[in-house]
Amino acid sequence: MTSPALVLRGVVKRFGNHIAVDGVSFEIPRGIVYGILGPNGAGKTTTLRMINDIIAPDAGEITILDGLKPGETAATHIGYLPEERGLYPKMRVIDVIEFFGELRGLKRAEAKKRAGSWLDRLGLGKWAKNKVQDLSKGMQQKVQFATALIQEPELVILDEPWSGLDPINAEVLRDVVDEIRKSGRTVLFSTHQMEQAEKVCDAVCIIARGKKVLDGRLRELKRAFAAEGLVALAFADDAARAKSDPILADPALVAEKRAARAHDHADCEVKLAHDTTPPKLLAALVGQGVAITRFEVVVPSLHQIFVDKVGEEAAVAERLEPGR
């Protein structure tokens, strides 16, 4: 059986009296895209730094690929894009990518070949001989992305990779991440952008205040939350809406009625009572002649799951500024 790409068991990191990472455990199979999500200060970046041996855990165990521990040997199998970008501003773009390739063990000719290929892949070919400082922030970020991938690592670790990218370049990055997955390699990243995570992740781990809140395959998590019975409703007119009121007020059918989410174009959402199913509620409405234009079991977005598990206040903060 193939060993996982990464395993964390009870990992703890303290800074003085502050516990930044508190007993976090998760396991990442090979060949998937895995996202670490959480509010600001949750411990995302600290976790990635421990995996990369930039800082050491105070307790717990980290195992990389075939039983490797964080350190020099494991580093040869890892490509890392840190949150704090760092390139040599006065070097030519192609030279800096070649340089990082050679640092990771490539022969000069191979490093030069791969650097050129990555520049073309990322739409930077015409900038190859420009100095890094001549590039925009987003373009520099793509250059650093290339430096993390030039040796074709088995495990790619990206800290806030979409920060600062416009929609076009964000799409390019998503495409590259998908190519890495299709090649059988593994991608681990942190992000505060739930919409990006939902587009690329196979599995996620949500952490808050240093503790793991939940983890698992994204599809399974969404299915589990959908099973809690949230239904979006829209009615043909005010008369139908009024006719539905006593049915939606029946505690045997509906546990909670709430306003529809913004831009959802529903009249309301209802959370079903414990022993109720969507067909049972639909039958009750139709049986009373309620004219319905929409009856939809809500499959939650990743953002909605995040809000449910972490809280609206933290989720709003996460949308407003990059997380760590």
Each language-model region and where it sits:
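ABC transporter nucleotide-binding domain
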Residues: R174-L272
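Non-catalytic surface loops within mature trypsin-like serine protease
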Residues: R30, D66, K126, F235-D237, ...
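C-terminal coupling/interaction segments
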Residues: A273-R324
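ABC transporter nucleotide-binding domains
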Residues: S3-L6, K13-R209, L214
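Non-catalytic alpha-helical coupling and interface elements of nucleotide-dependent molecular machines
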Residues: E102-G105, A226, L230, V310-A315
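Generic beta-strand hydrophobic packing signal
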Residues: V11, E256-K257, F295
